[in-house]
């Protein structure tokens, strides 16, 4: 039997079982757990390569073959870190296994035919498109920025740069919901809208859900009172939608105990649960220990650095329409920014107590940095806390699975859309992101939406090949024309579907129905199920989890930073 060295094999077909790959310039390493390909029967496209007629490509018709095959990909997902070929059919993931020609090759589960396109993923990492569950729809240009960072789904609210939207993630009322759904129809990203949840009577909330709100948002700037919380959650239980909350920083209508009492045992998604983005001062972070609370972070506090506190004060004044000449407004801002709780947030993420990350786009958060900052936290916590059990010193597979779940499967589960997006699994939309390992979490090599390339780095258009400088991200065919409609999805609640809303608004995109939100608990958050007893000292702001003091020094230097953004 002919043999080649492990290095030569990795260079040709990508890493295999036992090989390790470093994630960009972080301290994180992954080890390949399983290889679905067959040694000696690997497929590869190119001159003199395998995927040729009668060799790795068979004679089957389009009905039997894949539309697209990603060859020899290193998949990193919550369920595993594996080497496989990925087959895409009709815009969805159809198979994960061994690609090739079943007429002449053994073990083929991803058939390649004359109607099959190929993306060479040898030496590349493939992840699910990210889900940003805290979007202020302030401007449509956020979509391009997010796509080029590896995010393919938005959950949030807004109507443009209105004062209300600059502060709160709400699309209020049926008229605005209709207009925003129509606007979203032409954006090459999956979208679900949140209506305004601040009401003490249910009728105005029900009409927003039947008008297309896939969830409701309670925000302190609209009054997150116990009455509004109770009413909103009551409607959510009735109509199977998720509720997100930004609680009362000033503790005017009650403290965290009152909010938790109003919530009861009902499921709720708490935004920026640390509190710098808003919420009961100084102890909203305690909510992360509740069995029915699905806690997320927004990215400006991730990770804790020497610049975090100073940056936040100015951001907060702008976003929440505060006046620096009014002493009470300044005190409000300062009450939200606490070094101790920000430092504890990173540790709670590493422990699996915080389940999700998100952006808070243009409203104290950066829409293009969800993926990047999540991995900066993972890196920083490895340096501070060492390997995360059951990982040893050889790889960080469990820590990597924990962190990737925070912006993929967990927000999908939280908002009832995990049957459509959130992981690299058969049957789901082929929203896939390819990364060169050296650029992981920073600059994708390709971003696929519904099986079609939506954005990619592209060189000089007049070049003789695609790679001459200047190279920058550009929209691709999957983001243009009617192709957008068949590769993107608008999420609606069942109540809107029963009404025939998609037909009423003449929506052309794929429609996904969000459901099952009310059954999701903290125990369902993949790799992030910890429910510690969290305590905050009201005088010093020190945070303890199950009695352990959570402290760490701010980072002075980070990976995935300046060296990647010189050009």
Curated annotation (Swiss-Prot):
GO molecular function annotations of the record: nickel cation binding; urease activity
Active site: 320 (proton donor)
Pathway(s) per entry: Nitrogen metabolism; urea degradation; CO(2) and NH(3) from urea (urease route): step 1/1
Record-listed N6-carboxylysine modification sites: 217
E.C. number: 3.5.1.5
Residues annotated for Ni(2+) 1 binding in this entry: 134, 136, 217, 360
Annotated catalysed reactions: urea + 2 H2O + H(+) = hydrogencarbonate + 2 NH4(+)
Gene3D superfamilies assigned: Metal-dependent hydrolases (3.20.20.140), Urease, subunit C, domain 1 (2.30.40.10)
EC supergroup of this enzyme: hydrolase
Keywords of this entry: Cytoplasm, Hydrolase, Metal-binding, Nickel
Transmembrane spans: none
Cofactor(s) this protein requires: Ni cation
Urease domain ranges (all copies): 129-567
PANTHER family (alphabetical): UREASE
Subunit structure: Heterotrimer of UreA (gamma), UreB (beta) and UreC (alpha) subunits. Three heterotrimers associate to form the active enzyme.
UniProt similarity note: Belongs to the metallo-dependent hydrolases superfamily. Urease alpha subunit family.
Name of the molecule in the record: Urease subunit alpha
């Amino acid at each position: 039997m002919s043999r080649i060295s492990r290095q030569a094999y990795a260079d040709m077909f990508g890493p295999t079982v036992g090989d390790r790959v470093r994630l960009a310039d972080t301290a994180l390493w992954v080890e390949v757990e399983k290889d679905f390909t067959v040694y000696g029967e690997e497929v590869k496209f190119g001159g003199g390569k395998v995927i040729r007629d009668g060799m790795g490509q068979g004679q089957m018709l389009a009905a039997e073959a894949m539309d697209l095959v990603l060859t020899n990909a290193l998949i990193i997902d919550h369920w595993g870190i594996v080497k496989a070929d990925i087959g895409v059919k009709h815009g969805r993931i159809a198979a994960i296994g061994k690609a090739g020609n079943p007429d002449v090759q053994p073990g083929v589960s991803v058939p390649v035919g004359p109607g099959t396109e190929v993306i060479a993923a040898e030496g590349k990492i493939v992840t699910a498109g990210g889900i940003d569950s805290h979007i202020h729809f302030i401007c449509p240009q956020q979509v391009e920025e997010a796509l080029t960072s590896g995010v393919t789904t938005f959950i949030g609210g807004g109507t443009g740069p209105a004062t209300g939207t600059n502060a709160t993630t709400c699309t209020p009322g049926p008229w605005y919901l209709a207009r925003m759904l129509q606007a979203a129809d032409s954006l090459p990203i999956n979208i679900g809208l949140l209506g305004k949840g601040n009401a003490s009577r249910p009728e105005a909330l029900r009409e927003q859900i039947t008008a297309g709100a896939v969830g409701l948002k309670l925000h302190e700037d609209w009054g997150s009172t116990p009455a509004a919380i109770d009413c909103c959650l009551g409607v959510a239980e009735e109509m199977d939608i998720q509720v997100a909350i930004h609680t009362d920083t000033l503790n005017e209508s009650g403290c965290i105990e009152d909010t938790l009492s109003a919530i009861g045992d009902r499921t709720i998604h708490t935004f920026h649960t640390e509190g710098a983005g808003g919420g009961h001062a100084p102890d909203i972070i305690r909510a992360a220990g509740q069995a029915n609370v699905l806690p997320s972070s927004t990215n400006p506090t991730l990770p804790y650095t020497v610049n975090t506190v100073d940056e936040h004060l100015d951001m907060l004044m702008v976003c929440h329409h505060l006046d620096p000449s009014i002493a009470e407004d300044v005190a409000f801002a300062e009450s939200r920014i606490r070094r101790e709780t920000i430092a504890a947030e990173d540790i709670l993420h590493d422990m699996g107590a915080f389940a999700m990350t998100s952006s808070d786009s243009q409203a104290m958060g950066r829409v293009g940095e969800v993926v990047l900052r999540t991995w900066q936290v993972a890196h920083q916590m490895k340096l501070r806390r060492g390997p995360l059990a059951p990982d040893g010193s050889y790889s960080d597979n469990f820590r990597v699975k924990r962190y990737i779940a925070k912006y993929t499967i967990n927000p999908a589960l939280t908002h009832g859309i995990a049957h459509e997006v959130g992981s690299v699994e058969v049957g789901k939309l082929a929203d896939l992101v390819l990364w060169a390992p050296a650029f992981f979490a920073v600059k994708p090599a390709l971003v696929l939406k519904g099986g079609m390339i939506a954005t990619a780095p592209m060189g000089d258009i007049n070049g003789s090949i695609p790679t001459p400088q200047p190279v920058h991200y550009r929209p691709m065919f999957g983001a243009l024309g009617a192709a957008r409609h068949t590769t993107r999805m608008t999420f609606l609640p069942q109540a809107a579907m029963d009404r025939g809303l998609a037909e009423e608004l003449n929506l052309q995109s794929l429609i996904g129905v969000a459901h099952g939100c009310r059954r999701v608990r903290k125990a369902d958050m993949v790799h992030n199920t910890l429910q510690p007893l969290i305590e905050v000292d009201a005088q010093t702001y020190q945070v303890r989890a199950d009695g352990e003091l959570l402290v760490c020094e701010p980072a002075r230097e980070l990976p995935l930073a300046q060296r990647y953004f010189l050009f």
